[in-house]
Amino acid sequence: MYRTVDCMSGVFDINEIKTRFPATAETMLVDTRLTDEQEASCRVFRIYVDVPAHYHKSCDEYLLVVAGRGLFRIAYGKWFEAREGQLIFFKKATVHAIKLLDDQPLVFLAVDTPRRPPTDIHFVNPADGTPETFIRTEKIY
């Protein structure tokens, strides 16, 4: 799954990592952090339920769909289908939301620049969730 090349680099098997998420979760997302540097972090995460409109104050976000498909909305625009192989990008403080389309796992590879602290989740409607109900980190490499 992970092999250290040297103290400054590594190799991750995303196809293998995306199969290791639990079948169900008590949070909206479960993630596996691959890197966690101040300048940027990289994660693989699975979505378990529709994710209400929210934003992050600290980082720009790059999301590559590595499994499944879902509906995605950025900045109150139109919903569009996000599917495997598509890269989605948005700047910090951009509102976004995700809806599941079927019962297949929806998994993303995410790069946050700079690193996004786990507490940096702000729901448009605060009643929709908290950092604790939003995401759980399954494993850090």
Question: Can you say where each PLM-predicted feature lies in the sequence?
Answer:
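A short, N-terminal "cap"/entry segment at the start of jelly-roll beta-barrel domains
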Residues: 1-45, 52-53, 123-141
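Residues that act as N-cap/strand-start positions at coil-to-secondary-structure junctions
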Residues: 26-28, 82, 92
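Conserved hydrophobic/aromatic beta-strand scaffold that supports enzyme active sites
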Residues: 34, 42-46, 62, 79, ...
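A generic "binding-loop/recognition-motif" signal
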Residues: 40, 49, 58, 78, ...
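Tight coil/turn sites that cap or link beta-strands
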Residues: 48-50, 84-85, 91-93
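Short glycine/serine/proline-enriched coil/turn segments at secondary-structure junctions
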Residues: 54-55, 89
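A short beta-strand-loop-beta hairpin characteristic of the jelly-roll/cupin
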Residues: 56, 62-84, 94, 99, ...
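Ligand-binding loop in jelly-roll beta-barrel domains
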Residues: 92-120
